[in-house]
Amino acid sequence: MAHELDVSPSDRERPGSPPVVAPRSVDLARWCASRGWPVHPLAPGRKTPTANCERCRQPGHTHKGCACIQAGRWCHGFHAATLDFARIEQWWFNHPGLGVGVACGPAHLVVIDIDAHRQQPPDRDRLLPGIPIPRSVDLGGLANGFHTLGVLAALRGAVSPADDETTLRVRTPSGGLHVWYRAHGSHRWQCSAGSSSTRALAWQVDVRANGGYIVAPGTTTVAGTYTAVGPAREPAALPDWLARELARTGHLPPRASPT
């Protein structure tokens, strides 16, 4: 499988790059786990977790203390994510059609999920929460998360994460981009949706962190394959300016702040 994973034969136990062609899911899951990223199955051909068993679907049942997770089953999505290679082999060898998800929180990852959906932009005060955009600024042509994130980065004198070649970036089948970063120390960054009125980094820019998961590069759905782009194949440290913006927009629990 070395040629499929774009690694040398001597590096098979810890592949050095995510797949450049669609690999077997078990190899992809092992590649992620070898980096300390807990993995969990996604439904075949989809980007959502596999369904719970009948008992775990009952109202009021949660992942806390769930016997299924304790027994090594995959109920409750990213809550069942594991680094156990024996469990990984069992899950994906027996069910090779499953996709691979990565639990962001325990993996200490913050992933900037940039969307490119065709939508009418909201009022300018919703484009960059907490940052007023004067009426004198022409927003003609602004159409998606690539644009709003680019504006935010420009205001801070920084490179947009979409153009950050120092870190792992993954093109999504819908034309979006997942930009992977390593979280700072013990900070527990929180998830958000770019459309949220309570916590958001920018319009059409989601944040995947604690309490969420991300589709692993190399995973294939009915819509296409999540493909790593650019030279980097590992997440870089979360840039300081971006950490400050995440803190400013409420992505840390109360009484926590970045150093």
Question: What is each model feature region?
Answer:
Residues A2-P258:
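Conserved phosphate/metal-binding and DNA-contacting active-site motifs used
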